[in-house]
Each structure stands twice: as structure tokens, then as C-alpha cells.
Design a protein with these regions (language model features):
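Hydrophobic alpha-helical transmembrane segments of multi-pass integral membrane proteins
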Residues: 1-390
Length: 390
């Protein structure tokens, strides 16, 4: 039984989906990345489900990124539909389901592999159901795209678990790459909808309208890339490289049209542009990997995971957390520092090999910089996300 004071403190935390999932997802990413650094440097013994490499890849995507996506979509759907999303006990149960997945994958409770997979796999389908139910109620077909994307994320998760259970690294990689591309697709769609508006509002400039052909090519090429990696369809190397580079160029032109140069005095906006830059950089580097073979795929993939996904997430959760708790849309110096630290994490992780840096040292530095960036967010926003809206 909790005291009235405790109840008042806990209640706001489960009042809207972004509160528990943004805070818990961010804190989890700090713990997960530090655990990964510890394993790399043999600082301590850690034997999660499958193996540490599988756990790191899986948990930064299906533990961290999936939590943030859930918090964002289940909050945004209320604005889209005018209907109430999960809150209170139902939201707490969904959060506990997510937490259960993290625990059974990190620690050995003596459970069978199939049961562990089932616990983890059950989270995203519930999210898709809740989201889809609200969208269908008001027939808001424009936003229905997010439901099949989450369904495909579930398939990617199945592939990773199937690969772990059957000891098939190809399935693991397929699921891993698929999830990266699906989250990138979400950023592509949402970014196109809101980044020009955020740029205009934040800088006091005119909103840039999208060019229909450019928007179609950018989104369609990203959808195609996501489907290819999810299905595991093998294309000729030149075609796959060409598609990635073409899409990367489309993304870059799109970003330039949003006028990143007007954002330099507004951290809450330039951080979004900096995060989006990770998409063209990541796609083009991946294309060069397939063309030349001189770039490691696991390395250039972090152009997307840190540069695009991590950076965009940090910028978006900062903005949403401020706006939805009644604060001014001003990031402040500490969060601006966090944005910069995460950018350095991307640079160190992706380009270490060209500077001749030691592998373990570079990986550790990238992990620590990530931990600092999301640690700053977690500490700064903990009181805001656990107390009532102003």
C-alpha cells in the first residue's frame, strides 16, 4: 500500500505514454551501453541471453528505440485522434511488459528460450493494437502507416530471436538491419511532417513546403530499403549500393531545403537537423560499403543507429518532454552539450578506423559519450517527467 504522497508522485508518471517510456528508455540506454563497454573491456562478467553481441544490438533497438517510438506514438495519437490513449494502470501494465523483456534478456531466471522470446516479442504487437484501435476509430488513414511499420518491427524481432535460438547469425543480422531501417523510415516520415514546421516556428522564418517529387522519391526509396532488409531479399551489389546512395542523396537534398543554416542559434532545432543528417551519411556510407568493400558494414551502420536514430531521438524527446510538461521550448546549455556529445559519439564510432585509433578504445569512448548524452537527459528531465504538468 502506498501513501497519498507517493501516489501523487507516481500518478503523473503514468498519465501519458511519453513519460515512462522516454525516461525509462533513456535510462536503459545508458545502462545498456555502459554494460556493453564493460564487456568489451572485460571490466566485469556479464552473460545475457544469447550472447553479449546479440544483446547489445537487440537491446539498443528493441529495448531503447522501441520504447521511445512507443512513447512518442501513443502520445501523438491522442493529438491526431482526439481520443485518450493508454494511461494509469493500463499504461503501467504496458510499461511493465516492456520492462519484463529487458529483465529476462539481461539476467538468467532459468526460463526456456522460447518463453524468453515470447515475453519480449509480446510488447510491440500490443503497441500496434492500441495505436491501430484509436486510428481506426476516427478513420485517420493518413497515420495508419505506423501500424504496419510496428508489425514489421515485430517480424524483425522474431528474426533476431529465431536467429539466436537456431544459432543462425544471418537471421540475427537480417532482423537487426531490418529494425534499423524501419526506425529510419519512421524518422523519414515524421521528419518530413514536422521538421519544416519546427524549423519555421523555432527560427521565426517561413516554413519550407516540400517538393512532391522529392518527397515521393525520398519516402519511397526508404520504404523499399526497409522492405528489402526485412524480407532479406538479395539484390545485385551495384543495384543495392545505387539504391542506398540515391536515397541518401534524396535525404540530403531534403535536409538542405529545410535550411539548416538558419537553426544555428536554436539548439532544439539544429539538433533535429543534425540527427537527420545521419540518414544520408549512413545510407551513402552503406552504399560505398557494397561498392568498395573497404568499409565495415557494422561500422557504417552506426551512422544510422547513432547519427540518425540516437541523435534524432534525443532531440525529439527533449522537445516533446518540454512541450508536454508545460515548459518553454528552450533546450538550455546542458541539453545543447548532450546533443554535441552524442554527435561526437557518432564521429568516434563511425570514423575511428580512418584515424588509426584502437578499436576497443574508440568503441569505449563512443559508448561513454552516448551514456553522458542520455544521462544528461535522464537527470535533467527526471523531475519533469515524474511530476505534474506546469
Amino acid at each position: 500500500m502506498t501513501s497519498p504522497a507517493t501516489s501523487k508522485q507516481i500518478a503523473p508518471f503514468f498519465s501519458v505514454a511519453f513519460r515512462p517510456f522516454f525516461l525509462s528508455g533513456s535510462l536503459f540506454s545508458v545502462l545498456a551501453i555502459l554494460a556493453w563497454a564493460g564487456v568489451l573491456n572485460a571490466w566485469f562478467s556479464f552473460e545475457p541471453y544469447a550472447n553479449s553481441f546479440w544483446w547489445h544490438a537487440h537491446e539498443m533497438l528493441f529495448g531503447f528505440a522501441a520504447a521511445i517510438v512507443t512513447g512518442f506514438l501513443l502520445t501523438a495519437v491522442q493529438n491526431w485522434t482526439g481520443l485518450t490513449s493508454l494511461k494509469g494502470r493500463s499504461l503501467m501494465l504496458l510499461w511493465l511488459l516492456w520492462l519484463a523483456g529487458r529483465l529476462v534478456l539481461a539476467f538468467d531466471f532459468g526460463l526456456a528460450s522460447g518463453l524468453i522470446a515470447l515475453i519480449d516479442l509480446s510488447f510491440l504487437p500490443v503497441v500496434a493494437f492500441v495505436l491501430g484501435r484509436l486510428i481506426f476509430k476516427v478513420k485517420l488513414w493518413r497515420n495508419l502507416i505506423f501500424v504496419p511499420v510496428i508489425a514489421l518491427m515485430t517480424i524483425a524481432n522474431i528474426l533476431m530471436h529465431w536467429g539466436a535460438i537456431s544459432d543462425n547469425p544471418e537471421l540475427v543480422n537480417q532482423g537487426n538491419y531490418a529494425m534499423v531501417m524501419l526506425v529510419t523510415l519512421l524518422i523519414t516520415v515524421l521528419g518530413g511532417r514536422v521538421f519544416p514546421m519546427f524549423t519555421a516556428n523555432g527560427t521565426g522564418t517561413k516554413k519550407v513546403e516540400g517538393i512532391p517529387l522529392l518527397e515521393t522519391l525520398t519516402i519511397a526509396s526508404t520504404v523499399l530499403i526497409a522492405l528489402i532488409y526485412t524480407i532479406g531479399f538479395s539484390l545485385p551489389v551495384v543495384i543495392q549500393a545505387g539504391l542506398l546512395i540515391f536515397s541518401g542523396v534524396c535525404h540530403f537534398v531534403r535536409l538542405v531545403r529545410w535550411r539548416f543554416w538558419v537553426t544555428f542559434k536554436t539548439p532544439l532545432v539544429w539538433s533535429l537537423h543534425l540527427g537527420y543528417l545521419g540518414i544520408p551519411v549512413g545510407f551513402i556510407l552503406m552504399g560505398l560499403h557494397y561498392l568498395t568493400g573497404s568499409l565495415q558494414l557494422s561500422t557504417v551502420l552506426h551512422g544510422l543507429t547513432i547519427g540518425a536514430i540516437g541523435s534524432t531521438i534525443l532531440a525529439m524527446i527533449t522537445r516533446v518532454s518540454l512541450g508536454h510538461t508545460g515548459r518553454k521550448l528552450q533546450a538550455g546549455r546542458l541539453m545543447a552539450l548532450a546533443f554535441v556529445l552524442l554527435s561526437f559519439s557518432f564521429i568516434v564510432r563511425v570514423f575511428y578506423q580512418y584515424a588509426g585509433s584502437d578499436y576497443a578504445y574508440s568503441m569505449t569512448m563512443a559508448a561513454l559519450l552516448w551514456g553522458l548524452a542520455f544521462g544528461i537527459y535522464s537527470l535533467s528531465f527526471f523531475p519533469k517527467l515524474t511530476t505534474k504538468r506546469l
